């Protein structure tokens, strides 16, 4: 509601300024333009504005550009990596289980003296080995090759 009042005030003040300053400008400025009036245009009020129909206007058919069809899910093993993926090969576990090294590491982490040592528990599935495959991980090339 406040915006409507401000807008109305601005329109009225701009019209008042136009009428006031339009009647006080020199004669040679009134005659400049494409048309020279033998009278002051403000003397007869506002000039009529051509009416345009309100509401939605019917439009003709518009041409449609062909859209690329979305590709269905493809098997990652069938995709061939392109040359732009040459520097982004990362070997990851493709078997779906946790990979542990086949040999235990010899380095023991140092723990504070107040903690109780617990022996490491072997995870199931580690004895079965890990299958590793090359995956192209960075965004331009998210393609996995068959596991080795």
UniProtKB/Swiss-Prot annotation:
It comes from the Eukaryota. Residues 52-80 are annotated as: Disordered. The keyword Repeat applies. Residues 19-43 form a propeptide. Sequence repeats lie at residues 46-50, 54-58, 59-63, 64-68, 71-75. Coiled coil: none annotated. Keywords: Glycoprotein, Repeat, Signal. Residues 46-75 are annotated as: Repeat-rich region. Residues 52-73 have a biased composition (Pro residues). The keyword Signal applies. Residues 1-18 form the signal peptide. O-glycosylated. To B.pahangi filarial sheath protein. This is Major microfilarial sheath protein. It comes from Litomosoides carinii. The gene is GP22.
């Amino acid at each position: 509601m406040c915006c409507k009042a401000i807008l109305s005030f601005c329109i009225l003040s701009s019209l008042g300024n136009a009428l006031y300053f339009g009647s006080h400008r020199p004669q040679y400025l009134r005659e400049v333009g494409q048309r020279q009036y033998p009278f002051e245009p403000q003397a007869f009020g506002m000039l009529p504005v051509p009416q345009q129909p309100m509401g939605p206007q019917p439009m003709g058919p518009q041409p449609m550009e062909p859209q690329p069809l979305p590709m269905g899910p493809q098997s990652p093993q069938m995709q061939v990596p392109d040359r732009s993926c040459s520097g982004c090969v990362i070997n990851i576990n493709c078997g779906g289980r946790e990979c542990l090294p086949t040999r235990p590491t010899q380095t023991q982490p140092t723990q504070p003296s107040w903690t109780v040592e617990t022996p490491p528990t072997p995870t199931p599935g580690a004895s079965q080995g890990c299958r590793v495959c090359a995956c192209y991980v960075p965004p331009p090339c998210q393609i996995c090759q068959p596991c080795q």
